[in-house]
Each structure stands twice: as structure tokens, then as C-alpha cells.
Amino acid sequence: MHLNKMKKVSLKTYLVLFFLIFFIFCSFWFIKPKEKKLKLEKLRYEEVIKKINAKNNQNLKSVENFITENKNIYGTLSSLFLAKKYILDKNLDKALIQLNNSLKYTKEENLQNILKIRIAKIKIQQNKNQDAIKILEEIKDNSWKNIVENMKGDIFMKNKEIKKAILAWKKSKYLEKSNASKEIINMKINEIKR
């Protein structure tokens, strides 16, 4: 009887050890390839950024391919860099395409808001102020409201809607935490009142 109990206990111990070893083996089996994939994506991302920063514009097609293949943080960040390059080259339509494509697959709210603000800035440069306001109004997160209201004030000022501009800037100033930004907003308001 005592021998039977020992066999049951040792069998349980062996089973637990077997499953533990099996679990550890499987976790390494599945985790290692994911780590390698992330490292490869990071290396490819670094290469893409180098291509964007290079003076040669022929590299940009491969950058665009990287962005469409990588619908993740690396694709979004690459898209932001490429859009910046297009903006500096005065190619606003291509910049808009990059930002809009990234906006479609980006799930992180703060990145979405950054993309929307960049899109709105391009719309302002293209004198599509109503489109810019619509895009800015899509940003619902209160932590971005100071930036949204500041940009709305700039748009209203550009449209010669002075009262709306002052109101938007005052909202922005109220929501702003940075003293330097508050000072800039004050300068905008004081410039209008002269």
C-alpha cells in the first residue's frame, strides 16, 4: 500500500515536471522568433530612416514599400518622417497620402492625434481651412485641446474671423500648462487687439 502511494506521488511529480519543461520549451520556441522579427523590423526601420534623410530621392519608393508592409509603430513613424521630407520638398499631396494611410491602421490614440494634427497643418498650408477644422474637431482627447484650440485660432485669424480667433486662443491659453506657450498665445491676442 505504501509503495502504491509513492508510485502515484512520483508519477504526479514526473507529470508536473514534464509539463513544466514542455511549457518552458514551447515558450522559448514561440518567443524567440518574435524577438528576432522585432529586431529585424527595428533594423529595417533604421535603414528606412537613413534613406529618408539621404539626399537621394530614388530611395523613397523602397521607403513607401516598407511603410505599406509594416502596419505597426515602425510603419507609422517612418510615414511621419517621410511626410516631413515631402513637406520640406513642397510635395504636400504626397505627404497627405502618407499621413492618411498611416491614420487608417494606427490604433494608438496619441499617434492618431499626432497624425491628425499634421494632416490639419497641411490642409492649412493648402488653404483648405474648413477641412483642417473638421480634422481638428475629430480629436476628442482633452489633453490635446490646447493645441487644437491654438490651431483653430490661427485658422480663424487666417479667415479674418478675429472674434473667433481670440476666443479659441483664450481657450487654448486656459488649457495650456506651459508658461512659454501661454506667452506666445498672449502675444497673438495682443497683436490682434492693437
Curated annotation (Swiss-Prot):
Compartment list: Cell inner membrane
Periplasmic side: 32-194
Cytoplasmic side: 1-10
GO molecular function, one term: protein-containing complex binding
Any one cellular-component term (Gene Ontology): plasma membrane
Membrane topology according to the record: Single-pass type II membrane protein
UniProt key word Chaperone: yes
Classification via InterPro entries: SecYEG/CpoB_TPR, TPR-like_helical_dom_sf, YfgM
Keywords from the UniProt entry: Cell inner membrane, Cell membrane, Chaperone, Membrane, Transmembrane, Transmembrane helix
SUPFAM superfamilies, per the entry: TPR-like
Spans traversing the lipid bilayer: 11-31
PANTHER family xref list: ANCILLARY SECYEG TRANSLOCON SUBUNIT (PTHR38035:SF1), UPF0070 PROTEIN YFGM (PTHR38035)
Function: May mediate protein transfer from the SecYEG translocon to the periplasmic chaperone network via its periplasmic C-terminal region.
Subunit structure comment from the entry: Interacts with the SecYEG translocon. Forms a complex with PpiD.
Entry's family note: Belongs to the YfgM family.
The protein's name in its UniProt record: Ancillary SecYEG translocon subunit
Taxonomic classification: Bacteria, Pseudomonadati, Pseudomonadota, Gammaproteobacteria, Enterobacterales
